[in-house]
């Protein structure tokens, strides 16, 4: 008989199967066992098959095997325990609890209590979980006891006490990657990211050393082409998946989305169907392609429901919908999952999302809701600021740390509300109203990078506050001057425009040279660099808006390599369309006079865009937008614009000849 290219001779099945199990080649063992007809009716065969299925995390199949064993040998209570454990791991908590209550073997009492406590914990019934743990008679395993206590304290948001239990567990039982991860998670929730990263580094270092077969980092080295390692027991035992996901969460929280992606890329290579829910959730949030795949992944997880679905999924799906301005979709999700609203959304998060959705139909009502939120959190911030000042003069440094942490948490809640209040007038092009909202929130937020960035955008859009806008943009650029491409292209473009509008052309040129040199150094190793392209597009658009179409359009053509390069896409074409349409409007009204050579250059540019943009979509679609119609292309739109310009030239020539 052949199995995985290996011939098994008669009489050597037992030896071969046990060798596979010893070497943790469980899938091969399953394939061999399933090829033996007697396995499904014998105790030995079902026991081996159930064990292998359990180790490969196919808990449904494992539970089926142990269910047969319970009926086949009812006098062996261990099989009933394994059956209940398999059901629990499969997320079938009610069935697992029902089976566990029928177990009355004294020698298994502590294990049954442990399982029942885990079921209660999974059902978020923490008081029952604690009472069951207290009934255990065997307290010799101090590390396990401390870890369980830490988990219950963590769920009660008592992170400092939970951390102490985890540290005690590590001291009592030696290093355990799962307990070390729990300790790192406590530091993460306490905003102590450096300590959390220390634990993560140790988990990863030991995982790489002890399990080189997992191929940590192989995806990055092969650009995603590494062979999947699946979900072997070694991966579950190593804690690597949890560690890398926590590292990704830390990077994401600190605003380093690229670093978050890299952390997920360092995970042992697996196919998407093999990914655990937490990894799939985090990949959805950091998807570099766009929001579509991320939204679909989160929606898929939400449909799986608890306990498989991470509790953060519901809120993040709604926030991602709002980020992509899919407010109707967010409203539908809220309406379809009302049972999750009170379970997974805090009152603050619900009120914020409700205000964002309401703003689409009744902005005034949304402003009132956001105003109530802002006043409540603002009052709390003032009282916490006073508390921090009191603690600064007291000798208790721990009280000061707690007060500062509370203030930072409240500020994190206040900032999105302040941004949302400014966003409502921004959407209506009421930039003066948006500035007024920023001034109202300056008391608390003026030192936060997010507030300063968006305040700069508002001042820039005012059209007469370029100097003040530059004062906000400059620190952002200076902070990343050695890595200028880490700065958003829109920030660089707006700063250049602000310099030009305040007669600081030399500063604008120096900044553009800096960006150009950085792009030349980077080359094409990490994909297309569009920073300088976007800067030139924005500057060209500015000159067109001021009526200087000759220089503005030449700048735009230069930015897009004359329309023949890879920079031609829906994003960049939008700038071209606007400026050419502005030119056509001015020519038709005879408010613009353009030299013949400039018109010929524009026609040549549009002809090139037509040739190279034949298959490139010209419009940006939403992440979940699907239409049966063929989207318009840049080539088609360029041809129409060129035809309009030619017709205007013919008309103007006719008028000139008539006169």
Curated annotation (Swiss-Prot):
InterPro entries: TPR-like_helical_dom_sf, TPR_rpt, TT30. SUPFAM superfamilies: TPR-like. The keyword DNA-binding does not apply. Belongs to the TTC30/dfy-1/fleer family. Keywords: Cell projection, Cilium, Cilium biogenesis/degradation, Repeat, TPR repeat. It comes from the Eukaryota. The lineage of its organism: Eukaryota, Metazoa, Ecdysozoa, Arthropoda, Hexapoda. TPR repeats lie at residues 3-36, 43-76, 143-176, 178-210, 391-424, 450-483, 533-566. GO terms for molecular function: intraciliary transport particle B binding. Its main location: other. It is found in: Cell projection, Cilium. GO terms for biological process: intraciliary transport; protein polyglutamylation. One of its GO terms (cellular component) is axonemal microtubule. This is Tetratricopeptide repeat protein 30 homolog. Required for polyglutamylation of axonemal tubulin in sensory cilia. Plays a role in anterograde intraflagellar transport (IFT), the process by which cilia precursors are transported from the base of the cilium to the site of their incorporation at the tip. It holds the Pfam family TPR_16.
């Amino acid at each position: 008989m052949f199995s995985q290219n290996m011939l098994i001779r008669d009489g050597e099945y037992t030896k071969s199967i046990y060798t596979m199990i010893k070497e943790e080649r469980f899938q091969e063992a399953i394939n061999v066992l399933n090829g033996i007809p007697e396995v499904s009716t014998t105790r030995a065969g079902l026991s081996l098959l159930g064990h292998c299925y359990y180790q490969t995390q196919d808990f449904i199949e494992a539970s089926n095997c142990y269910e047969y064993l319970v009926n086949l040998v009812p006098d062996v209570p261990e099989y009933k325990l394994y059956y209940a454990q398999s059901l629990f791991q499969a997320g079938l908590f009610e069935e697992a609890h029902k089976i566990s209550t029928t177990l009355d073997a004294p020698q298994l009492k502590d294990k049954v209590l442990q399982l029942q406590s885990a079921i209660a914990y999974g059902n978020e019934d923490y008081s029952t979980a604690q009472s069951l743990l207290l009934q255990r008679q065997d307290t010799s395993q101090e590390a396990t006891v401390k870890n369980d206590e830490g988990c219950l304290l963590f769920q009660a948001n008592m992170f400092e006490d939970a951390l102490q239990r985890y540290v005690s567990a590590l001291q009592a039982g030696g290093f355990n990657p799962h307990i070390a991860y729990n300790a790192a998670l406590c530091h993460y929730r306490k905003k102590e990211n450096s300590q959390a990263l220390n634990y993560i580094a140790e988990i990863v270092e030991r995982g790489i050393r002890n399990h080189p077969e997992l191929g940590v980092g192989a995806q990055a080295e092969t650009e995603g082409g590494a062979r999947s390692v699946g979900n072997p027991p070694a991966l579950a035992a190593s804690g690597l998946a949890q560690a890398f996901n926590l590292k990704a969460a830390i990077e994401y929280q600190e605003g380093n989305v690229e670093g978050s992606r890299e952390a997920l890329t360092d995970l042992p290579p697996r196919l998407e169907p093999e990914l655990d829910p937490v990894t799939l959730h985090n990949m959805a949030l950091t998807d570099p392609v766009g929001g579509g795949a991320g939204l679909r992944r989160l929606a898929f997880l939400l449909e799986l429901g608890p306990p498989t679905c991470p509790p953060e999924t519901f809120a993040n799906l709604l926030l991602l919908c709002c980020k992509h301005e899919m407010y109707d979709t967010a409203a539908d999700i809220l309406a379809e999952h009302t049972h999750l609203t009170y379970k997974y959304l805090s009152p603050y998060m619900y009120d914020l999302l409700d205000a964002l959705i309401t703003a689409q139909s009744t902005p005034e009502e949304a402003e009132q809701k956001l105003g109530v939120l802002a006043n409540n959190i603002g009052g709390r911030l003032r009282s916490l600021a006073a508390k921090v000042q009191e603690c600064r003069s007291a000798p208790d440094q721990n009280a000061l740390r707690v007060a500062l942490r509370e203030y930072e948490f409240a500020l994190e809640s206040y900032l999105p509300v302040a941004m949302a209040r400014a966003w409502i007038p921004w959407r209506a092009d009421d930039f003066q109203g948006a500035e007024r909202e920023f001034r109202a929130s300056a008391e608390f937020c003026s030192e936060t990078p997010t507030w300063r960035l968006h305040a700069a955008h508002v001042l820039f859009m005012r059209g007469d506050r370029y100097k003040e806008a530059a004062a906000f943009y400059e620190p952002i650029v200076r902070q990343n001057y050695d890595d200028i491409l880490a700065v958003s292209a829109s920030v660089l473009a707006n700063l250049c425009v602000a310099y030009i509008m305040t007669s600081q052309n030399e500063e604008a040129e120096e900044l553009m040279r800096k960006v150009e040199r950085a792009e030349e150094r980077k080359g094409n190793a990490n994909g297309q660099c569009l920073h300088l392209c976007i800067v030139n597009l924005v500057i060209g658009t500015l000159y067109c808006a001021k009526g200087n179409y000759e220089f503005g359009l030449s700048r735009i053509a230069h930015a897009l390599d004359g329309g023949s390069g890879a920079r031609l896409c829906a994003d960049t074409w939008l700038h071209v369309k606007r400026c050419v349409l502005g030119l056509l409007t001015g020519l038709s009204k005879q408010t613009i006079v353009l030299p013949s050579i400039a018109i010929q250059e524009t026609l040549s540019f549009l002809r090139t865009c037509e040739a190279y943009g034949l298959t490139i979509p010209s419009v940006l679609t939403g992440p979940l937008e699907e239409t049966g119609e063929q989207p318009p292309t840049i080539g088609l739109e360029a041809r129409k614009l060129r035809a309009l310009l030619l017709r205007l030239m013919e008309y103007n020539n006719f008028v000139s000849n008539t006169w």
